[in-house]
């Protein structure tokens, strides 16, 4: 049986250092993260010169616009999560993956493996979408595997002998789903003997990207007010942990309905509204959280960020959440009544299938 696979390849500008990786997405299961593994191939000249080669896992966190930077002030942090020498070889035992074993046989004696352990508390790959004509670096969290030649791992790397390959830290939907989301809110009014009650229920807690969200709405009007209109929204919550006031929300899908309205005192109404949150409807809006961009990779809305606890939040990260919000409009003097239900929006875990044919992609 022949197993086919895809390999990502990127060489330094001087072609002396080449990086091979069989994947660019590494799964975070909350308690642990898949190790980052690959192969570095060196030119014969670097071997003869006994040049020192290092590999690093870099987390790049940009928290401000590049256009707003001034001399001596940068809104960017580059964090070295892991640093490891590749050549000369160190006397350490590495548990090679099957893919690394195959690549070592194919690439020859100038190939050297590495495995980098990503900290479980490191933030997920998330960037904030920019305007279409904005060519600056986006705000958010991005990861890179960096291979360079230098005297030590703190040495300033030269561009001609450096390889940077973007990767992503991703989370997939859990296998166990939570309880069905449901909430009931009530509002009483001055000089009104009764209450206005709004009950909102979702058909489930977990949704995959592109799926339709079914919102069951039940209104019981025991007050003397009149419900004029109903509006349902899907909101994306973004929490930039570094800032105390770094929380904001974006409405990424909404629908309004006047069917069954006006809802007079003593009446009730039950209806279902459907919403589909997707990036296609928000592709021109700045500030929407999307999955960290990787070359040749179609992106989507950022998935819900799963963390073990609030204390485990990384200071250089962005926490993404989603909620359905239903609002009843009661007119100019009556005000509004709102109900909110959080839910999880993620990708399903892909099945492990072989690629249709073997290929090496230039990154």
UniProtKB/Swiss-Prot annotation:
InterPro entries: Arrestin, Arrestin-like_C, Arrestin-like_N, Arrestin_C-like, Arrestin_CS, Arrestin_N, Ig_E-set. GO terms for molecular function: G protein-coupled receptor binding. Gene3D superfamilies: 2.60.40.640, 2.60.40.840. One of its GO terms (cellular component) is cytoplasm. It comes from the Eukaryota. Keywords: Sensory transduction, Vision. The keyword Signal does not apply. The keyword Ribonucleoprotein does not apply. GO terms for biological process: G protein-coupled receptor internalization; signal transduction; visual perception. Belongs to the arrestin family. This is Phosrestin-2. The gene is ARR1.
């Amino acid at each position: 049986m022949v197993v086919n696979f895809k390999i990502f390849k990127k060489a330094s500008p001087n072609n002396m250092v080449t990086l091979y990786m069989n994947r660019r997405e590494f799964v975070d299961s909350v308690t642990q993260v898949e190790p980052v593994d690959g192969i570095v191939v060196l030119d014969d000249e670097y071997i003869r010169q006994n040049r020192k080669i290092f590999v690093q896992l870099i987390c790049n966190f940009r928290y401000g616009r590049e256009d707003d930077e001034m001399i001596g002030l940068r809104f960017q942090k580059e964090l070295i999560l892991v640093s490891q020498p590749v050549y000369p070889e160190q006397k350490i035992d590495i548990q090679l993956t099957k893919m690394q074993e195959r690549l070592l046989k194919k690439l020859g004696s100038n190939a050297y493996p590495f495995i980098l352990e990503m900290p479980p508390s490191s933030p997920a790959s998330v960037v904030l979408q920019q305007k279409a004509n904005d060519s600056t670096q986006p705000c958010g969290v991005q990861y890179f595997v960096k291979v360079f030649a230098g005297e030590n791992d703190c040495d300033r790397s030269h561009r001609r002998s450096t390889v940077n390959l973007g990767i992503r830290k991703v989370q997939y939907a859990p296998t166990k789903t939570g309880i069905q989301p449901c909430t009931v809110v009530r509002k009483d009014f001055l000089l009104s003997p009764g209450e206005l009650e709004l009950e909102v229920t979702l058909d489930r807690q977990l949704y995959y990207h592109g799926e339709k969200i079914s919102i069951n709405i039940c209104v019981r009007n025991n007050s003397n007010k009149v419900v004029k209109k109903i509006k349902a929204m899907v909101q994306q919550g973004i929490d930039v942990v570094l800032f105390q006031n770094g929380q904001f929300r974006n409405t990424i899908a909404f629908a309004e309905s006047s069917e069954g309205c006006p809802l007079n005192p003593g009446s009730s109404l039950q209806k279902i509204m459907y919403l589909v949150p997707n990036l296609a409807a928000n592709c021109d809006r700045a500030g929407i959280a999307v999955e960290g961009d990787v070359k040749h990779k179609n992106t989507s809305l950022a998935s819900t960020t799963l963390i073990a606890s609030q204390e485990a939040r990384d200071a250089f990260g962005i926490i993404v959440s989603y909620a359905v919000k239903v609002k009843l409009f009661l007119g100019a003097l009556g005000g509004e009544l709102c109900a909110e239900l959080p839910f999880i929006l993620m990708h399903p875990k892909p099945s492990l299938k072989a690629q249709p044919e073997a290929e090496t992609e230039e990154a």
